[in-house]
Amino acid sequence: MNFNSQGQAERTYDAIVIGSGISGGYAAMELCKKGYKVLMLERGRMVKHGEYPTANLDTWDLEFQNKVPREEIANHYYKQNRLSWWVNQDNKHWIVKDDEFDYDEKQRFDWIRGHHVGGRSIMWGRHCYRLSDLDFEANMKDGIAVDWPIRYADIEPWYTYVEKFVGVQGKREGLAHLPDGEFLPPFDLNCAEDHFKQAVEKAFPERTITPGRTANLTKYIPELHHGTRGQCQARDRCWRGCPYGGYFSSLSSTIPVANDTGNLTLMANSIVHSLIFDDATQRATGVRVIDAETKEEREYFSTVVFCNASTIGSTAILLNSKSERFPEGLGNDSGELGHNMMDHHYGMGGFASFDGMLDKYYSGRKPNGGFYIPRFRNIDEATRRTDYIRGFGYQGGLARVTNVNAPIGPGFKEAISSPGEWQFNATCFGELLPYHDNKMMLSDTETDQYGIPKLVFDAGLKENETKLRADGVACLEEMMDAAGFKNLKTYNNPTAVGAAIHEMGTARMGRDPKTSVLNQWNQVHAVPNVFVTDGSFMTSSGTQNPSITYMAMTARAVDYMDKELKRESTI
């Protein structure tokens, strides 16, 4: 490849941020606010806030009643649609086509992506839960993998800092293992969900049911919620993009704030091939980029580089950044780069019906799913299991669902005008341990259309996850039974790493450069001007949705970098 570095001065910035999603947007905003000239590189197409073509369409406005034809799925979304609920007419424009961006897998691996400005921050589930020292101390206490190089006290103020800007609605519960945050008023449980809460907490005092905590503005505070934000309309169409800015995304929040500083340059359709490494200084000096439309090759330069291209994207870039100093990928002295792939495993849960409270209903379509049940196994000695370590949590809710069996006519009209009985559903999310042999690699023989090595995945669940899943399903069944629900059904289906869309851990943090890629400040051990603050850095997965942790760690890393540069560090 012949990368064009002519006009280097015009292509030099204080910082380069790779990726425009949850963590990339936050990195760019924090850097720009501190006065740094920032180049943000996004491999996908340009999208601006408000450019959400299906946001205000109803199901009957969408082609094929929101379904995607089987032929189209078979031709373009054969891996993306292995999550059978995922690819629809209202969101397929956010989803990559497998025939254009394929990958190999030694075990089934579900890599769900969106190539566009804003990334998956447009499509995310928005649940925001803090990690705790139960998570940060877990590897050390269990004697597996490596110890996190931080504790909750190190990140606690950054959770607070980020939550105020993001806008997280929720209810304080006082749980040490699921710390409370800076919450906006919650979307309260509806009457049937509250019945479930009361019944379960009476039968199982160690279990807590709380409204799901999500990044939706139940109260818009202009002094805090900068960008193009507005109060959540409770439409529950967030995955299409929200023209009101009711939920947090890079497009509605961090990118507009960064742009307002005058310090941001955003380039879409810019695929980062690799980082440029200078043997003389032992620092990264910039990035090599391929234009997604013209395939032109060029270089950009900076003092620092933030890798926020997603766990898989950033790890692939680092693995492909080979030099005499780093023949196996930039910063890969430990040999851990690409290993320890984690996700949350699901595909387990339950359904039921509830024939009480038929005289009650609810208003709006709250976008938080309903309730969250935080982990209650292996919290302390009283909840210790001997057959597996770690735990699981649940997300679910109750709603009145009308199932119409009447023929077309007056009976049909009456039936669809009346609410049906309450239907319960809940999904269990389990922790996946950081196994060294769960990994991603670069192909030695195949490249994509841009000449970049194709990715190969080899990751799966093991015995601990199998035992955990069985208990998660059994616990859900006993909770449904305690609530007096009828027609109980549980499931524990085969699943794959990646299916929860929380992939993480392939450039983990640690205390020792011999066993980890990053230090406690998200710096590559051997290349301290390269920071990785997307999910790659995770040392264990916990059971909580991870995005708020990515943002908190990103803000913390930028603050550290800024202070180091201002004291003329050798960063």
Please annotate each region the language model reported.
Residues N91-R120, W124-G125, R130, G143, ...:
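FAD cofactor-binding and catalytic pocket of flavoenzymes
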Residues N2-N139, I144, P149-T160, G313, ...:
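N-terminal glycine-rich phosphate/pyrophosphate-binding loop and immediately adjacent elements
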Residues K33, K37, E42-E63, Y244, ...:
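Glycine-rich loop(s) and the adjacent beta-strand/alpha-helix scaffold that form part
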Residues T210-T218, C232-C238, A268, H273-A280, ...:
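A glycine-rich dinucleotide-binding beta-alpha-beta segment and adjacent secondary-structure elements
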Residues H49-E51, Q169-G181, K486-T495, R567-I571:
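Short, glycine/acidic-rich hinge or "gate" loops at secondary-structure transitions
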Residues G25, G35, L224, R229-G230, ...:
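Aromatic-residue-lined binding/catalytic grooves and analogous aromatic/hydrophobic interfacial grooves
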Residues F64-D110, H115-H116, W124-R130, D135, ...:
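Conserved redox-cofactor binding core of oxidoreductases
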Residues S540-V558:
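A conserved FAD-binding loop/helix module that cradles the flavin
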